[in-house]
From Swiss-Prot:
EC annotation from Swiss-Prot or TrEMBL: 7.1.1.-
UniProt-listed HAMAP family: NDH1_NuoA
Catalysed conversion reaction: a quinone + NADH + 5 H(+)(in) = a quinol + NAD(+) + 4 H(+)(out)
Name of the protein this chain belongs to: NADH-quinone oxidoreductase subunit A
Organism: Clostridium beijerinckii (strain ATCC 51743 / NCIMB 8052) (Clostridium acetobutylicum)
Length: 118
């Protein structure tokens, strides 16, 4: 069993080293000739007008986080529902605890006003 983890660890270390070598090689080999054209903001092939830096409302981020939370819940809940009969009572209690934690998180987000549009 330790050998399995050793193989995974070696693979992770090797992939990390490979990624660093590729990034380092690319930064050493690339041409370094910055000019105004290369440093300008490019958006869909059209010259930008006005300021390219805009204020981003954090409420979009909070809605995205809550959506991601319940999207992950669906990823765990659907396979569990398919195998519900064969998993037994212990899996039911595990899922009740999981959903309970998510409900507490939703309640906290609601209480903090993360779901209100301001």
């Amino acid at each position: 069993m330790i050998q399995d983890y050793l193989i995974i660890g070696i693979f992770l270390i090797a992939s990390f080293i490979f990624g660093m070598v590729v990034l380092l090689t690319a930064s050493l080999v690339r041409p370094k000739k910055p000019n105004k054209e290369k440093l300008s903001t490019y958006e869909c092939g059209v010259e930008t007008t006005g300021s390219t830096w805009i204020r981003f409302k954090v409420s979009y981020f909070m809605y995205g986080l809550v959506f991601l939370l319940f999207d992950v819940e669906t990823v765990f809940l659907l396979p569990w529902a398919v195998k519900f009969k064969s998993l037994g009572l212990f899996a039911l209690f595990e899922m009740v605890i999981f959903i309970g934690i998510l409900i507490i998180g939703l309640w906290y987000a609601w209480k903090e006003g993360a779901l209100e549009w301001k």
